[in-house]
Regions:
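Glycine-rich anion-binding surface patch
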Residues: 1-79, 84-93
Length: 93
């Protein structure tokens, strides 16, 4: 965690413009699609992750928009937080 305010909001459906993985066995895909918004120092990035049902620790990031103005440490904190939120939701389902 950095000095910046870090907020992750997870919601049950993917944001417009994102789609789940289409390769592989769809029955093995986790039903919960994780759309997330991370806000760091007033800058917002969007990410959408899917987890494999058989490997909840394997989070597949479909998109993460980086702002070059955000320091690398903050980007790392956002990726770690997104990963942790996704894993927790994956375990709960």
């Amino acid at each position: 965690m950095t000095d910046h305010d870090l907020m992750i909001k997870a919601f049950g459906s993917a944001p417009e413009g994102f789609s789940p993985l289409t390769s592989g066995d769809d029955s093995q895909r986790l039903q919960v699609k994780l759309g997330m918004t991370a806000s760091v120092g007033g800058t917002t990035v969007d990410a959408c992750c899917w987890a494999d049902k058989t490997k909840p620790m394997q989070i597949i990031t479909k998109a993460l928009l980086f702002d070059p103005a955000i320091p690398d440490d903050d980007l790392r904190a956002m990726r770690e937080s997104i990963f942790l939120v996704a894993v927790e939701v994956g375990r709960a389902t």
